[in-house]
UniProtKB/Swiss-Prot annotation:
Coiled coil residues, start to end: none
Record organism: Buchnera aphidicola subsp. Schizaphis graminum (strain Sg)
Top-rank EC class of the record's enzyme: transferase
GO cellular component: DNA-directed RNA polymerase complex
Top-rank lineage group of the source organism: Bacteria
UniProt GO BP: DNA-templated transcription
Protein task: DNA-dependent RNA polymerase catalyzes the transcription of DNA into RNA using the four ribonucleoside triphosphates as substrates.
Subunit structure: The RNAP catalytic core consists of 2 alpha, 1 beta, 1 beta' and 1 omega subunit. When a sigma factor is associated with the core the holoenzyme is formed, which can initiate transcription.
Catalyzed chemical reaction(s): RNA(n) + a ribonucleoside 5'-triphosphate = RNA(n+1) + diphosphate
Record protein name field: DNA-directed RNA polymerase subunit beta
EC number: 2.7.7.6
Keywords: DNA-directed RNA polymerase, Nucleotidyltransferase, Transcription, Transferase
Amino acid sequence: MVYSYTEKKRIRKDFGKRPQVLDIPYLLSIQLDSFKKFIKIDPEGLHGLEAAFRSVFPICGYNGNSELQYVSYRLGDAIFDVKECQIRGATYSAPLRVRLRLVIYERDVLEPTVKDIKEQEVYMGEIPLMTNNGTFIINGTERVVVSQLHRSPGVFFDSDKGKTHSSGKVLYNARIIPYRGSWLDFEFDPKDNLFVRIDRRRKLPVTIILRALNYNTEEILNLFFEKNIFNINNNKIQLELVSERLRGETASFDIKKNGKIYVKKGRRITAKHIQELKKDKINSITVPVEYILGRIVSKNYLDPKTGETIILANTELSLEILTKLKNSSFFSIETLFTNDLDHGPYISETLRIDSSHDRISALMEIYRVMRPGEPLTKEATENLFENLFFSEDRYDLSSVGRMKFNRSLLRKKIEGVSTLNKEDIIDVIKKLIDIRNGKGEVDDIDHLGNRRIRSVGEMAENQFRIGLVRVERAVKERLSVGDLDTLMPQDMINAKPISAAIKEFFGSSQLSQFMDQNNPLSEITHKRRISALGLGGLTRERAGFEVRDVHPTHYGRVCPIETPEGPNIGLINSLSVYARTNSYGFLETPYRKVHNRLVTDEIHYLSAIEEGNYVIAQANTNIDKNNYFIDDLVTCRHKGESSLFNCNQVDYMDVSTQQIVSVGASLIPFLEHDDANRALMGANMQRQAVPTLKTDKPLVGTGMERAVAVDSGVTVVAKRGGIIQYIDASRIIIKVNEEETYTGEAGIDIYNLTKYTRSNQNTCINQKPCVKLREKINKNDVLADGPSTDLGELALGQNMRVAFMPWNGYNFEDSILVSEKVVQEDRFTTIHIQELSCISRDTKLGPEEISSDIPNVGEAALSKLDESGIVYIGAEVTGGDILVGKVTPKGETQLTPEEKLLRAIFGEKASDVKDSSLRVPNGVSGTVIDVQIFTRDGVKKDKRALEIENMQLKKAKKDLTEEFKIFELSLFSRIKKTLVSFNIKEDFLNKLPYEKWFKIDIQDRNKKKEIEKLLQQHNQLKKEFEKKIEVKRRKITQGDDLAPGVLKIVKVYLAVKRQIQPGDKMAGRHGNKGVISKINPVEDMPYDENGIPVDIVLNPLGVPSRMNIGQILETHLGMAAKGIGNKINNMLKKQEKISNLKKFIQKAFDLGENLRQKVNLDDFSNEEILDLAKNLKKGMPISTPVFDGAQENEIKQMLKFSNLPTSGQISLFDGRTGEKFERPVTVGYMYMLKLNHLVDDKMHARSTGSYSLVTQQPLGGKAQFGGQRFGEMEVWALEAYGASYTLQEMLTVKSDDVNGRTKMYKNIVDGNHQMEPGMPESFNVLLKEIRSLGINIELENE
């Protein structure tokens, strides 16, 4: 196996048994590909902005004299880059410019001829751009647009499963769902009549829509029924026999022919009877008159002589009418063939309740339902019906809808028009009747073949189209009203509606969410999330159990484990590792093709619709070294069921064992040994882990860690290979390999690192280089670690030495006992950064002012502020400290003559301003790490703002100058090479200034040209550098675009260092969570025979009932991994030969069945072995992929190799007494996480504070600085104890007795500890409520 530069530093021992056939795909492609499709110019106009423009344009005026046509569009460049937008609170977007053509036609001419054409580029608002990591910056905050799982357009057949009607009768229905437009529902009622609903309005008989489609009664009956033909000869009635139709009926007369009786009267007609009739070629039988009476005729019969109607279609035959027909010489009568079994008379019955008799009356009936109360006209009714389903402007089935529609109706062709036609509606009704007749089955709406993914690009396109449609109306008005000769396209278009639609979507849509940025995993999971909620989706309240449940088609597409607990369970899912969406938006998953027992490496992606037809084997099926199945019977999936199949029947095989789970769940080692509920908690809690100050890779991982760290975008990855030329904390510079440079470029890559930046969740984003100077690196190597990554691997927590044992009740109910050593070593210390803003506004009474001159504030409070009134960087502040001094003007008060005089003498201004400074919130303390000042254009900048500006300018100039110098050096080194090849001495060149190098005359013309080219390049570089500096200077010095009325914004960033403490929540990766109960001195912790104390003590009772055994296996394997690390460490300390070290490490890698990974250290140099050993001395990292991990015997082998007991249990001694504990204890290394539920954020206390206006009781919650609720159950408790005075205190002075609490406060200040309870305000509220009911109630004094 070939290792990259960073992988060589620390190799994970992999226990995977099955080779990795398919690499893990780029994990953010669902977001990036979708948005790329949206903004990329699509010549066919099927996707993105192009499709939206083409669907709305051209726009014609109402009078048809003019037309506005769309030509093309282009996206400009963003004004600010991503980081600048985040700092300034701006949106990262690009201007959209559209080329439009206004065509004016000649009036009063029969053939329209073009009079004038005007073409112009028009600005159409801003389009937010996606960053490289799949997010959007909206108003300075990073947001993610979550993909939506919605019902696919098409036709769906369903039933109510007998729940609607009291009789329990199953009622079938069909629904045509377009991508946009009106829904069309067909449904049976309990009487078996068929109805239609448009847009869920009042139901109408289905025949109304058929009449509206211009069918008469005869045509309707012809469409849906087979005919029985009765011939009348010599007063005998002969039935033209279709023998299959008789099956299942009871003969009401003897069925005979030529004297032979085939079926006796009263007998049921069976298949055997029908066979006999066929055998004897019986085509007709004589039937009694009673047999034909009551049957329904299929067409109108008119008297040929008089033209009088004898009988109308869909009427029952009676003896009288039969005689009339005979008399009018009708000797052949057509009736409808119906029976109770499989040819129901539904349409015939529905025609009877239909009040309409022709097309116009049907259209009017539809109009009355859709537009009740509006006046009826023939044109209006026709227009409405035409626009409902047959107009491209109002109805769009989309290519997906048409494909699903045609597939559902078993048509051969799956493409077609995107509107409905007559045949579509009739075919749907026919299929629904077939289902009612027992032929065919209803659809499963939770099948992933009926639900599709709508990603960012598609949702943005829909929003954009909505904006365009709003513009279209205005344009039509202007084209009809305005003076066309002077109008230009620019005057037609108002970009506001488009911008508003886009802004509304990205800013306030339910699916555009504030990014979860706790750690790299939470970012990646948020971008891969799939929600069934949102516009056009489900709502929490209406979603039933079936929609939320795991469906067989989720296999390999949607994770069955990762979903939130609570009301959203099952509605918000996560994409599986290998899943992707196809061109129609359906999820598909990869499989390996199988040919005659041979499993090939050919990969096919199948959607849920296609998958049902194949037999698919599991990924862990046994195959030999030639990739043939070993067993004859193999466990497979087919049509959603799992069972054993002969290996010759197998079509496909799963690609990987981790195919079914999401990224989050695939990071849980030994997932196969955990209960699903706990695995769900484990996957969810990993997303809440706070990045620690010192990162530590997991000793026991799953091999997914590197993929998550790299794809999340928090690490810095090399774009091209080369040598590290320069490195410091904030930038890495690489001299690119010659073969990877383009012609005419300097061959230098510069990577700037992010330092101590605040994330959305107030955690700290900081990147640290993990490479050294002059090291050779390859493309895609990790250069710098971000938050929660260690040498390019995800590192969410710390490896802790844990013991499973009770310890003096400190681990009761999942509590965790932690050693003081963990705090001392800063193992779980985290940095949190808070942003506090102070806004200076222009008020009615005058502008607010930011200054250090604040009324009634002592010198001490202002000691941390500079003369501009803004806190210094580096100041340590605590709750209540002033960060930014601000004064607000208050209303003028009447002054006495004395005050006026004093003010005139001393210029005293303090009385007409009030203090509105920004202070540190209660309970928060930290260090000021940065200050940003934004000043409105035209407002004078203060001294501090100018200082910050100068600093930024200096830094930008220094960075760009250094960059330029490096590029320049690179260029001159190339020139030096060329000149030295002409026997010009290097020493001579070094003494010569660079400018004179170009003047050296060379005979070789080609080389001379080359040098001239390099000179041009140098000049070009210089120009670019100057331009860059100018752009940067302009950006830094220009005024900021602030909200109306805002003069200045000061943002102060506070960094808080938080150590772990009692009350913090911790968890493992298996759903084993708990709260720290005590930080115990290290000397009191249990220790082993070597005197090594444990770090954490966990409760063993937390394991059996929770059934998450994965944590125990992880602990054992972690112990073995640490043991190997200790051995390597001892060898390093003893300075053993590198060959011995190499042998030992090779031996460790060869333990167990390493079928996936064969590590060969022969290719490694001595330095590389030493580097590897140094990184392995803290423990050998292990990868145990989900469902393909280490077996029990392999863990024992590892423990044995580390000279540890194979039981994984060791004897421990009590740290306080030194006594040995009664029995051996499970001790090992578990990966523990500190979750973002910190006691500092939750702990809160109040003495006095704000009160509710109505009840006068203290507010609730930390945010409102509220009190503790003393509810009715607490009142009962005090009543039960008889603590009457305590209770009185609680209900009066400590709550809503306004006078009492004021008096009590005064008494305490005076040192008088007495209280006088009065009337609680809530009693007055009760009186008022009773009075509001019209009952007078008064308090009487006795």
